[in-house]
């Protein structure tokens, strides 16, 4: 599992925020290990969500929200990736991005498209906070810029 460099923002200490973080980690795991959605979901439900592992207490997460994100991203990835590719420069092409950053962008874009009931600001803030937990450089700014641009196109 990818290392989290920063501390959790207070916004991540809610069930949906915890589900988003877990979904990003699961998408990263699926990308790196090549595991399937149901296998990964079962592993997270059994071993990660709401568990104390090696002294680390995992946050109480909304499992249905987590499952919706990971299944949705995998199902819609062929539509999501070209949309993300259009937003990125040659220096930040999708294939060159860190796997965890790709997972963050895919999950955030999927949620913007498919969860119209969630305010844009909530989606953007949550995924920028997740990016800040993993990265100390320009990556959170990239997440903010890409999701902001996509939100303007998707939710006019």
From Swiss-Prot:
Q: Which domain of life is it from?
A: Bacteria
Keyword Transcription tagged: yes
Spans through the membrane = none
**Which SUPFAM superfamilies does the annotation name?**
NusB-like
Q: Which InterPro entries match?
A: NusB-like_sf, NusB_fam, NusB_RsmB_TIM44
Any one Gene Ontology BP term: DNA-templated transcription termination
What keywords sit in the KW lines? RNA-binding, Transcription, Transcription antitermination, Transcription regulation
One Pfam family here: NusB
Q: Which GO terms describe its cellular component?
A: cytosol
What is this protein for, i.e. what is its function? Involved in transcription antitermination. Required for transcription of ribosomal RNA (rRNA) genes. Binds specifically to the boxA antiterminator sequence of the ribosomal RNA (rrn) operons.
Q: Which NCBIfam families match?
A: nusB (TIGR01951)
What PANTHER family does the annotation carry?
A: ANTITERMINATION NUSB DOMAIN-CONTAINING PROTEIN, N UTILIZATION SUBSTANCE PROTEIN B-RELATED
Q: Give the family this protein belongs to, as stated in its UniProt record.
A: Belongs to the NusB family.
**Name by which UniProt lists this protein:** Transcription antitermination protein NusB
């Amino acid at each position: 599992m990818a290392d989290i460099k920063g501390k959790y923002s207070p916004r991540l200490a809610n069930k949906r925020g915890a589900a988003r973080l877990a979904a990003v980690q699961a998408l990263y795991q699926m990308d790196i290990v090549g595991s399937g959605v149901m296998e990964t979901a079962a592993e997270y439900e059994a071993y990660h969500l709401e568990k104390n592992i090696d002294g680390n207490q995992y946050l109480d997460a909304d499992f249905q929200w987590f499952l919706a994100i990971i299944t949705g991203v995998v199902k819609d990835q062929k539509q999501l990736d070209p949309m993300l590719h259009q937003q990125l420069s040659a220096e930040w092409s999708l294939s060159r991005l860190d796997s965890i950053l790709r997972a963050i962008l895919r999950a955030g874009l999927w949620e913007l498209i498919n969860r119209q009931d969630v305010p844009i600001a909530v989606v953007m803030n949550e995924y920028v906070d997740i990016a800040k937990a993993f990265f100390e450089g320009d990556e959170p700014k990239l997440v903010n810029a890409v999701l902001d641009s996509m939100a303007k196109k998707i939710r006019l």
